[in-house]
Amino acid sequence: MMKLLYSAEAIAARVNDLGDTLNRQYKEHKTVHTVVTMNGASIFAADLVRRITAPQVLHYTGGSYFKGAIKQEVAMNPETLPSNFNQAPVLVIEDILDSGNAIRQLRHILAERGAGPITVVSLFKRIGSPSVAEHSAFSLPRELFVVGYGLDMDGRYRELPAIYTFENTVMTGQSGQC
């Protein structure tokens, strides 16, 4: 049985807050390159980019972390990114920050390709995870598996307007934890 974790209204309020923060940050910039890292970030990204008033160029790396509730290795496609950002600012939009490895790897790629200031914003940051994002909408316990608002389980539940967890369901990884 699914249990509501964050309502659509709570999510919208946080997206608005993050949009306001990013608008102050990017108010002087002509163009911001926005990189959406994970498939699960798609709805969060769609709502957030519409709140940002600076002109943006959108890029998608199309990564994915999970098969069902089991953590897998991340697979991103950096070939979708420009070869040179010409020192333009880059906004990275992530769904859930776990280990931070994918973001560290992406920051390295972006820096090699001439990115200006890099800002990472995530929908969730797992409690106890390394701080690799400048902004996160919500915190999430390490063992909790969530769906909705773009996040899925085996391709299902992405379309839900709120974020839910399943009662008595926890994530598992290769070592039994995230």
Where is each model-derived feature located?
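PRPP-associated nucleotide enzymes
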Residues: M1-C178
